[in-house]
Amino acid sequence: MQSLKPFHTFAVPAQAKNIVEITALEQLQQVWDGCRQENQPVLFLGQGSNVLFLKDFAGTVLINRLMGIEHNEDEQFHYLHVNSGENWHNLVEWSLSQSIGGLENLALIPGCAGSAPVQNIGAYGVEFKDVCDYVDVLDLNQGKQFRLTNAECEFGYRESVFKHKYAQGFIVTAVGLKLAKAWQPVLKYGTLANFDKSAVGFQQIFDEVCAVRRAKLPDPKEFGNAGSFFKNPVISAGHFALLQQEYPNIPNFPQDDGSVKLAAGWLIDQCQLKGYQIGGAAVHQNQALVLVNKGDATASDIVELAHHVRQSVAAKFDVYLSPEVRFIGELGEVNAEQAIS
């Protein structure tokens, strides 16, 4: 067995039968075929920034190290072809160094490019789907590559076809990004709303997003964590109207379909849970949406804490939080919401 601690940011004690770093598609196919012959479970990991290992993993963990960025352009757009092992934040920095705007709101989101479409990552009013042109996928059982258009990815809030139809036996090998040369800032959220739309540049937005995220979010090197642990819940307009009567200042984001998205961090904060600790796991002092490993947390500490947070928010607001983090059991991914219910 090999330790998974260096390969995931929650840094809980967990091991895998084998760990293989993948640098080429041929190698990936070879290792996959070998695991299939031995009936061994396989797990793909990028930066390990959005997973919690509940138990030791009984099979082989493949670490994505497929690197490389290609840049093309026409009169209207920049086109980036990014291999899936590239670090997402490094990609954002690289694009700005090439004077390409459009990714600055997504700065400092942990993980690699291949995870971006799976989660449809998003922050500060921009989601991956807004910049995605296509996603390249390898069907490991057939040994064939294919390309999905943006529409075929079926993106939703922290949601995509890669969590369903293409969850097993498929891997994202590259993403295609399409970024308009006629850059428009997105200043809807938080302190970005203070900028003058006609005067701001993408570097300023990048710097502000980084400053805010660094102030709020703990460094995984100091306290193990997986960023935002819970998704922001979406509720009906009727439910929201009732909550707003009792909590007039409740942060809310109306959705196109009439539903209303709430800020999970605010809901947790109202339950006075910042700093609340179970075993070695705690709700972070500065950002209630983040659960941290204080150094000696076990997976069960984190699950128990997540359960307590979920129950507390449900009791106060009748809103049930769902984890954004993926839970990995002995044989692969398990239902995270069930695990903390």
From Swiss-Prot:
It is an enzyme of class 1 (oxidoreductase). It is found in: Cytoplasm. Pfam families: FAD_binding_4, MurB_C. The keyword Aminoacyl-tRNA synthetase does not apply. It comes from the Bacteria. Keywords: Cell cycle, Cell division, Cell shape, Cell wall biogenesis/degradation, Cytoplasm, FAD, Flavoprotein, NADP, Oxidoreductase, Peptidoglycan synthesis. One of its GO terms (molecular function) is UDP-N-acetylmuramate dehydrogenase activity. Residues 12-182 form the FAD-binding PCMH-type domain. GO terms for biological process: cell division; cell wall organization; peptidoglycan biosynthetic process; regulation of cell shape. Its EC number is 1.3.1.98. The active site is at R158, S228, E324. GO terms for cellular component: cytosol. Pathway: Cell wall biogenesis; peptidoglycan biosynthesis. PROSITE patterns: FAD_PCMH. It catalyses: UDP-N-acetyl-alpha-D-muramate + NADP(+) = UDP-N-acetyl-3-O-(1-carboxyvinyl)-alpha-D-glucosamine + NADPH + H(+). Its cofactor is FAD. The keyword RNA-binding does not apply. Cell wall formation. Belongs to the MurB family. This is UDP-N-acetylenolpyruvoylglucosamine reductase. It comes from Mannheimia succiniciproducens (strain KCTC 0769BP / MBEL55E).
